[in-house]
């Protein structure tokens, strides 16, 4: 409705101009909303921007199913390093996963091509890592500055899980294996050490760690539940 929300939009603009904690992409996104609001108030037709056509794809679903079903958690890696350009291409898909309020709050802290440092990082996972030293160690974190209510903490785990799956599948498509390392058992001393080694700020919630590299061997194919065991039709 024309004129509706004008007071709130002014407050939003003031907040955006003063806030230094927002990520640039989030700040730009919110600023664009503000600009579109004023364009609408001036009579500009913005319907195409906010009511776009559904984007379809000709991607072969069988190929996608094969990619998903052939992925394995791998714990044996070659010493071969991963080119930085390939890593960037893999990491780029993380924030294309669904995420709450378009926060795009996942942060990846990456250590690569430093076997001694990676070995020390893996020790923080109490040995639940891999059988040799991989070329890349990643700590998956979530920027909590954008979370307001205590219940929103769960959002961090949901968003990070969705984004991490994107990363894992993209890596698999390039012949790079991964293994997600559980962090729920970490002691406070281990968390403090990880934060210090990777310079992770206190407002970045550590969700999980992951190792990745070119596999030197595969992993057994685990038995999967039948569809009827986990899909309940109502």
Regions from the PLM with identified roles:
Residues 1-234:
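Acidic, surface-exposed loops and disordered segments
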């Amino acid at each position: 409705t024309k004129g509706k929300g004008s007071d709130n939009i002014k407050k939003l603009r003031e907040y955006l101009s003063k806030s230094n904690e927002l990520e640039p992409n989030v700040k730009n996104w919110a600023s664009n909303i503000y600009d579109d609001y004023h364009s609408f108030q001036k009579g500009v037709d913005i319907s195409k921007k906010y009511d776009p056509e559904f984007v379809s794809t000709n991607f072969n679903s069988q190929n996608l199913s094969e990619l998903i079903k052939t992925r394995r958690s791998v714990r044996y890696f070659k010493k071969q390093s991963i080119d930085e350009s390939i890593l960037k291409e893999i990491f780029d898909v993380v924030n294309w996963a669904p995420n709450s309020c378009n926060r795009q709050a996942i942060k990846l802290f990456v250590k690569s091509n430093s076997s001694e440092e990676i070995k020390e990082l893996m020790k923080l996972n109490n040995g639940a890592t891999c059988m040799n030293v991989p070329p890349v160690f990643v700590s998956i974190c979530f920027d909590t500055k954008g979370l307001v209510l205590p219940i929103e903490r769960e959002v961090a785990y949901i968003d990070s899980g969705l984004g991490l799956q994107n990363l894992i599948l993209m890596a698999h498509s390039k012949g790079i294996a991964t293994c997600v390392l559980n962090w729920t058992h970490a002691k406070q001393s281990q968390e403090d050490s990880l934060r210090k080694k990777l310079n992770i700020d206190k407002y970045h919630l550590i969700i999980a760690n992951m190792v990745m590299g070119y596999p030197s061997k595969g992993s057994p194919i685990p038995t999967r539940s039948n569809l009827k065991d986990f899909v309940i039709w109502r």
